[in-house]
Amino acid sequence: MAIWVDADACPNVIKEILFRAAERVQMPLTLVANQSLRIPPSKFIRSMRVPAGFDVADNEIVRLCNPEDLVITADIPLAAEVLEKGAAALNPRGERYSPSTIRQILTMRDFMDTLRASGVQTGGPDTLSQRDRQQFAAELDKWLLEVKRRTA
């Protein structure tokens, strides 16, 4: 089991939470991005640089992740693809995607894209709050505990 991060847009504070968790539980953590990333020295943490381009990092994560891995992403289509492979998906705000909710979330995303394409100003997401960070850490710990129980 491993944790994969769609790292180009992942907030630094979330990366820091992931770095500490990977060290604490000694689990492989890979940050995938199309730019160089700073990571702490660790035998559990690595970065993977991919060429720039549309969905290149996403496609690499889908290719490399395995069932029961965890993928950290705010990219809803990527979350849908890794769920189909049997991996778990968690966004940086602490929302865990599930097979039962991902279709509805994809539909809402597509609807918002249509609105934006027609000129409607929809605004972006709120800045990451302390509550979001706490929710992310709690959901990450919950997943790590599930993994520990399955492998015990």
Curated annotation (Swiss-Prot):
Disulfide bonds: none
InterPro entries: UPF0178
Domain of life: Bacteria
UniProt xrefs under Pfam families: DUF188
NCBIfam families to which the protein is assigned, alphabetical: PRK00124.1
Family: Belongs to the UPF0178 family.
Protein name: UPF0178 protein Ent638_0858
Protein source organism: Enterobacter sp. (strain 638)
High-level lineage: Bacteria, Pseudomonadati, Pseudomonadota, Gammaproteobacteria, Enterobacterales
